[in-house]
Structures are given as structure tokens and as C-alpha cells.
Amino acid sequence: MKQKIYDYTIVALIFGCALIIGCQPKTTQQSHEPTPDSSWALLPFVKVDSINPILNPGDNEFECPILKRTVKWEEKDVFNPAAVVKDGKVYLLYRAEDKVGKYAGTSRIGIAVSEDGLHFTKMQEPVLYPDNDSLKIFEWEGGIEDPRLVATEDKQYIMTYTSYDGTTARLLFALSPDLMHWTKYGTVLNGKYKNTWSKSGAIVARETNGSIVATKINGKYWMYFGDTDLFMASSDDLIHWNPVEEDGKLKSVLRPRAGQFDSRLVESGPFALLTDNGILLIYNSMNLDEGGDPSIAKGAYCAGQALFDANDPPKLVHRLEKNFMMPDKPYETTGQVNQVCFVEGLVHFNDKWFLYYGTADSKIAVAVKE
């Protein structure tokens, strides 16, 4: 029950202050300072407008083992990168599309490296791509998309990625000792969920001496995934994953919210970061055309943050009410898919946080938290 306030002088003062504040000019910001209810969040991120976008499509070629001919594998678009710090450098593993085939673009994973986290040099060929292997049935000819990346305790790297066969997207994963050579392990979900539409696997990890390392909670590794609601899976070894269920179905741990920036869908961003406050998950979202947030564009992809219980990973503790990043630059509002900021790569480098994101499914940009 709310306590009644009888001191009309105080009421008048409060009302007057509110009027003064309400009459101040409104500004639109990409990020906001933490408030008492969002002090757990990783904020603020500022877009580096002076150099964005930092990665663009190019003319690099490689010999496609399936087509058996040379293709310009990144000439259409580059977007949605994972990021990792290795040997004092930042590596981006990014999605790239050619202009070939019935989907007018097969996706592959390329790699670029930077000394400062801002200026990148691409490698000539992709490092992960559809091949004549046992996973071709899942990966061809839509391709391999949207990587997420963390290190493992035994000095390897695990990448989750999406395969697309033209009908169903599936969440797959691969391991590498050096970021250049990858061994595919197949689908994350198996059994009755093997052919379920699944995407965007964000493994829970901690920061250790500048590296982001997959970490166990209650004796298990954990992963958030999904692109409608968010769901979870756990693993003893990072290889064999078991979905978290409720009443025999995938348990939803984060849902869209009517009338808000994340009204249509929610989708994992980078890895989920274990902090002193809990498990911090930066996530992507889409605004409904009708019934969403009227202050942002219809169908816009914006970024939010949520906090989960460090001892009970499916338990949601806090969630930002407003997005902290939205499309407002020309290269974010216009492209292959308009109105998109899609966050996917995060590193702690040179005492700053670098957040890498796809813009309009066409290019790559960066925002920095000091």
C-alpha cells in the first residue's frame, strides 16, 4: 500500500520540478549512463563514427569445394562478426556472402585482424565454409552464418554458428586451436530437436587475463540460444548439449515484450558474460510493425541487455527497459535488410570494451565503452 503524503508544500515543489524537467529539450542518445536499476549493465557504448563502418564487402576469391570453381566469397555483404583477443590482437570472424546460387548468396566465415581494435586487415580466404562433408546437408547452399566465439580452458576456441539448408536454420558448433583451422562437430540440438529451427548460441564465459573463457556453473557449461524467445542448453564437456526443458518443451528464459523495442523477437548477441552481479547477456531484438515501440522504426533491430542469476542461469533477474543501441546511421538504416544494428562480437582490449555489430546486414561497425 502506498503511503499518503499530506505535506502539500513538498507536493508543490515536486510538481514544479517535474514541470521544469518536462519542458527541457529532448535529446536522442545511443547509450545511457547506468542508473540504480541498470548499474549491472555494460554501459555506455559509443559508436565510433569517425571510422564506421570498419569492414566492407570485397573482391577476395577462393575455390569453392562444392561448386569447384572460384567465387568472390565476400563481394555481396559482410556482417555479424564474432570477436576474440589473441596474442595482443583483435580477430574478427565475420559472416560474408557471395552473389552465387539460388539464394543469391552463400554465407561463409572470414577472418580479419587488428592491432588497435578499429582498423582491420582481412585474410584472403574464409576459414569456415560449406564443404563436401557430413554437414553439407545442413550447410548447403544457404551456408554458415553468424558466429559466436569463446576460448576453452584447454586453450582452444569454440564457435557456435548457424547452418542454413534453404529450409531450416540449425545451431552447430566447431573447435579450433588457432582460429584458422576448424573441426566441425555438428548440431547442438539432437534427438527430437535436431530439425528444430535454432540459432545464435551464446556460451556463458568469464574474463580471465583478457581472454573470454567458457566457464562452468554448478558443474555445467551453459548456452543461451534462439531467435524468437531465448532458450538454454547445458553441457558437461562443451560437446554434448542438453536443452533445458519445461513440460517436455524448450523452456523460454527471455521473451519479447509488447509495446517495447524487443516486441517481435529476442536473439542472443555475443557470449554471455559471468560478472559479480550475475550473467550479463547482451541481446538483439526486433520491433513489431504494429504493437511495438512507436518511437523507433518498424521492424528495427536494436540491442538490449539482461541479467541472469549466476547460480541459476535460466532465472532472469534484471532487464533494461530501453535499448542501448539502435539503427540511426545511413549504413545502419539502409542495406540488404534495412534498420539493423546486430551486435555479436565483444572483447575487452586495451582497457576498453569493443562491441562489433552488423549494419543493415551489409557492413560491420564498432562501438566502444571506455
Residue ranges of predicted features:
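Donor nucleotide-activated moiety binding/catalytic core segment of transferases
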Residues: D262-S268, Q339-F342
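Sec-dependent N-terminal signal peptides
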Residues: V11-I14, A18
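Bacterial N-terminal signal peptides that target proteins for export
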Residues: K2-I10
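Beta-rich carbohydrate-recognition and catalytic domains
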Residues: Q24-N80, V84-G142, V150-R264, L273-Q336, ...
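C-terminal motif of bacterial Sec signal peptides marking the signal peptidase cleavage site
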Residues: I20-G22
